[in-house]
């Protein structure tokens, strides 16, 4: 690939994304597919573009992304996190704006495990008094 590319790893729920950015024309490739093909939902596409729109670099950078694990929402969040980290590596002066928007922080929320004796993580079997 290019000699002047920047890298960022993003994670969300059970998804992990590797993001490579380099100066270009705004081309986004996710797992060898375009953004529109990979994410059918407009909300997922919006989440992916959020950090680029914030720093006004939607048409100045090319992105090459590989993402695995989880579902659509988790993958979109992981890509957003990865893009944010790669942008900070690209230009450290972008950090305060990205931090203020809340994109730098890793969202630590994940699925709570199912407990023994319960139906789900917190749902208990029906209680009978008599």
From Swiss-Prot:
GO terms for cellular component: cytosolic small ribosomal subunit. The keyword Ribonucleoprotein applies. GO terms for biological process: translation. The keyword Ribosomal protein applies. Keywords: Ribonucleoprotein, Ribosomal protein. GO terms for molecular function: RNA binding; structural constituent of ribosome. Signal peptide: none annotated. InterPro entries: Ribosomal_Su5_D2-typ_SF, Ribosomal_uS9, Ribosomal_uS9_bac/plastid, Ribosomal_uS9_CS, Ribsml_uS5_D2-typ_fold_subgr. Pfam families: Ribosomal_S9 (PF00380). Belongs to the universal ribosomal protein uS9 family. PANTHER family: RIBOSOMAL PROTEIN S9, SMALL RIBOSOMAL SUBUNIT PROTEIN US9M. This is Small ribosomal subunit protein uS9. It comes from Aliivibrio salmonicida (strain LFI1238) (Vibrio salmonicida (strain LFI1238)).
């Amino acid at each position: 690939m290019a000699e002047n590319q920047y890298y960022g790893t993003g994670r969300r729920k059970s998804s992990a994304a590797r993001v490579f950015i380099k100066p270009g024309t705004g081309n986004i490739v996710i797992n060898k597919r375009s953004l529109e093909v990979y994410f059918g939902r407009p909300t997922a596409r919006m989440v992916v573009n959020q950090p680029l729109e914030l720093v006004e670099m939607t048409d100045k950078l090319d992105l090459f992304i590989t993402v695995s694990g989880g579902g659509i929402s988790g993958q979109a969040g992981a890509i957003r996190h990865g893009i944010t980290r790669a942008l900070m590596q690209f230009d450290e002066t972008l950090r305060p704006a990205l931090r203020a928007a809340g994109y730098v922080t890793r969202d630590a929320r994940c699925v709570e495990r199912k407990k023994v004796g319960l139906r789900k993580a917190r749902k208990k079997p029906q209680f009978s008094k008599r």
